[in-house]
Amino acid sequence: MSPTLALTEDLIRRRSVTPEDKGCQDVLIERLSAAGFQCETVVSGPDHFRVTNLWAVKRGRAGTDGKLLVFAGHTDVVPTGPVEQWRSDPFEPTHRDGKLYGRGAADMKTSIAGFVVAAEEFVAVHPDHAGSIGFLITSDEEGPAHDGTIKVCDLLRTRGERLDYCVVGEPTSVSTLGDMVKNGRRGSLSGKLTVNGVQGHIAYPHLAKNPIHLAVPALTALAAEQWDDGNAYFPPTTWQMSNIHGGTGATNVIPGHVIIDFNFRFSTASTPEGLKSRVHAILDAHGLDYTLAWTLGGEPFLTERGELSEALSSAIGAECGVATELSTTGGTSDGRFIAKLCPQVIEFGPPNASIHKIDEHVDVAFIEPLKNVYRRVLETLIA
């Protein structure tokens, strides 16, 4: 069994559902310390939601003046869902038909194992490497992400730490390893809209004011709005409703208010402030009595073609035999926090078709090439 596969299986066995780490980072600390890394644990969050973070760094011969390449990842996984629907124990790595099954196999314990082994191999061959290698690992990426990567980034910022390159191990591939990497992500802006009316008997609408009826024209206008045209890197911004709550449960009562949850996934062609302003203008134009609470999940980020994307594309071509596609599709990731500290952030990992699903898995044949891609990037940028 290869060291990468063995480490992947060890991590999968640990039931690290957010925010639990279940010793995953202890395993990484043992491995990285043996390879010469200085490891620091950063614990954050309230008593009922303690998050474990790891910052590990091995300085090159140029010290802090040299380039620093960081791998970012998360040891936490999403819940399994109905265990009885899995063909095998989700926390017992199982091999079937050339695939490794287990929660976190694709998202993202294989990536973590791959980069750790790549770093071990790299420093063994290049003990006097010029640049530095870092690891930023959290147990709160799949959850609210308030006490994970963002806290470590804040800490590094206060120390004046400069990050030059960051590879995030998210599962970005689609059909085969390396066919897609993410060089950016859209921003996420959510709103909770409450439209007020007057509750009353449904048989006497003239004595009430139905907030659902009042809200519908405004919601229709919001759904039809063209927020922007996107750009060369991002598709147009989207606005989607996710929940509508109204009524008392009775069929003969006009509700006093209705609550609508919605979300923007927005490109660099728009700003949170601009989107908020336009939403309020549409609601005001319809004369609604409303309140609106906003939550900014993250701003968009983009890494244009440069040293990191070229190194990664070249490594993928050499190891996987495919021409990779740079993409900004999909949801948010911790890259949004790191991008404020690091000018070049690229996400790359195994295919994502099974992530968060029953019987999550990774092709065993992709595990060593993934590690080799990571090692080639280290060779190119910091040897």
Curated annotation (Swiss-Prot):
Binding site for Zn(2+) 1: H74, D107, E170
UniProt keyword annotation of Hydrolase present: yes
Catalytic activity: N-succinyl-(2S,6S)-2,6-diaminopimelate + H2O = (2S,6S)-2,6-diaminopimelate + succinate
GO MF: acetylornithine deacetylase activity; cobalt ion binding; succinyl-diaminopimelate desuccinylase activity; zinc ion binding
Cofactor binding note of this UniProt entry: Binds 2 Zn(2+) or Co(2+) ions per subunit.
Stretches that traverse the bilayer: none
Pathway(s) served: Amino-acid biosynthesis; L-lysine biosynthesis via DAP pathway; LL-2,6-diaminopimelate from (S)-tetrahydrodipicolinate (succinylase route): step 3/3
GO biological process per UniProt: diaminopimelate biosynthetic process; L-arginine biosynthetic process; lysine biosynthetic process via diaminopimelate
Cofactor names: Zn(2+); Co(2+)
EC assignment: 3.5.1.18
Hydrolase recorded as keyword: yes
Family affiliation: Belongs to the peptidase M20A family. DapE subfamily.
Function: Catalyzes the hydrolysis of N-succinyl-L,L-diaminopimelic acid (SDAP), forming succinate and LL-2,6-diaminopimelate (DAP), an intermediate involved in the bacterial biosynthesis of lysine and meso-diaminopimelic acid, an essential component of bacterial cell walls.
Protein name, per record: Succinyl-diaminopimelate desuccinylase
